[in-house]
A protein has these predicted regions:
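Hot-dog-fold acyl-thioester-processing enzymes
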Residues: 1-82, 147-155
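HotDog/MaoC-like acyl-thioester-processing domains
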Residues: 1-10, 93-155
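Short alpha-helix capping/helix-loop boundary micro-motifs
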Residues: 85-90
Length: 155
């Protein structure tokens, strides 16, 4: 499937998308610590905590951007938003500079209002490793383009 349209969603169960590899560096780790106040909450250094270890919640926060960059979804026919997570597991460590590979598999598509709830299994794996670093089951809502605009006009 090259570009998935809104009308393609009901038949997309089982579709797998591979994202481009990415790596997180010191700049991203520092920015995340500052934005989430981890730099304030953990003032005392924990000597046994490796400085190069990527925080699990930083990986989780990458889901949306990495999925958007990997997605063949047509932004001209639909738009989506976060609906929630059913399950998240941090299985293996990720360290600064390691290349992370992302995979997204559509597990379910269910009608919801004028759109669909879409469940994707999102897997991040460090390149060269067998075990995934993180697996998250993530629900999104997808609506046909124009739905939000029409709702705003009625408000």
């Amino acid at each position: 499937m090259t570009e998935m349209t809104f009308d393609d969603l009901p038949q997309s169960v089982g579709h797998i998308t591979q994202g481009a590899p990415f790596a997180l560096g010191e700049e991203e780790l520092d920015a995340f610590a500052k934005a989430t106040w981890l730099d304030k909450a953990y003032l005392d250094d924990i000597p046994e905590f490796p400085e190069t270890l990527v925080e699990g919640f930083l990986l989780l926060s990458m889901l949306d951007a990495a999925a958007k960059l990997a997605s063949p979804a047509s932004s001209s026919t639909m738009w989506g938003l976060n609906y929630g997570l059913d399950r998240v597991r941090f299985i293996a460590p990720v360290h600064m500079g390691q290349r992370v590979l992302s995979t997204y598999e559509i597990l379910a598509v269910e009608p919801k209002d004028n759109g669909y709830k879409v469940l994707r299994r999102c897997t991040f794996t460090v390149e060269g490793q067998d075990r995934p670093a993180m697996v998250a089951d993530w629900w999104s809502l997808a609506f046909p383009r124009g739905t939000v605009e029409r709702a705003r006009e009625r408000s």
